[in-house]
Amino acid sequence: MLLPKRVKYRRQHRPKTTGRSKGGNYVTFGEFGLQATTTSWITSRQIESARIAMTRYMKRGGKVWIKIFPHTPYTKKPLEVRMGAGKGAVEGWIAVVKPGRILFEVAGVSEEVAREALRLASHKLPVKTKFVKREELGGETNES
């Protein structure tokens, strides 16, 4: 699973989940990508589950790029504990995904294989997504 090697502060405030993604909106490394159309937190376990689903379908052919990283810790207090008495312990790590963000990129396989692999990965994620292709001049074309 993905998590930072070290952080300056162990616990953080919850991140903002409004607006569109500022960066990472174009397919840059691969030929095809999976683009988010809604906002959500994605945990490191969900990212790993989506990666496994893609690589198994592609039978280890081609290359996969994970374009998001769970930098932000989220905390949780134990069950049946009263309010107060400090912030809870770190439960896991999340990546905040906003609309327009490319989550995964794939190269080295046909479009049909890439489309199905990214569809399987999208079922593991809590965001709505769409399949995008890379253009020659650096951008991407939006295809549903």
Swiss-Prot record:
- What's the family? Belongs to the universal ribosomal protein uL16 family.
Q: Which HAMAP family match?
A: Ribosomal_uL16
Q: What Gene3D superfamilies would the database entry show?
A: Ribosomal protein L10e/L16
Question: Mind listing the UniProt keywords for this protein, alphabetically?
Answer: Ribonucleoprotein, Ribosomal protein, RNA-binding, rRNA-binding, tRNA-binding
Q: Which GO terms describe its cellular component?
A: cytosolic large ribosomal subunit
Region annotation Disordered: residue ranges? 1-23
Q: Which gene encodes it?
A: rplP
Provide the function of this protein: Binds 23S rRNA and is also seen to make contacts with the A and possibly P site tRNAs.
* Xref: Pfam families: Ribosomal_L16
User: Which species is this UniProt entry from?
Assistant: Staphylococcus aureus (strain NCTC 8325 / PS 47)
Instruction: Name any Gene Ontology BP term.
Output: translation
Q: List the disulfide bonds.
A: none
* Alphabetical list of CDD domains matching this protein: Ribosomal_L16_L10e
Query: Locations of Basic residues compositional bias?
Result: 1-19
Q: How does it assemble?
A: Part of the 50S ribosomal subunit.
Q: What is this protein called?
A: Large ribosomal subunit protein uL16
PROSITE patterns documented for this protein = RIBOSOMAL_L16_1 (PS00586), RIBOSOMAL_L16_2 (PS00701)
Q: Name one GO molecular function term.
A: rRNA binding
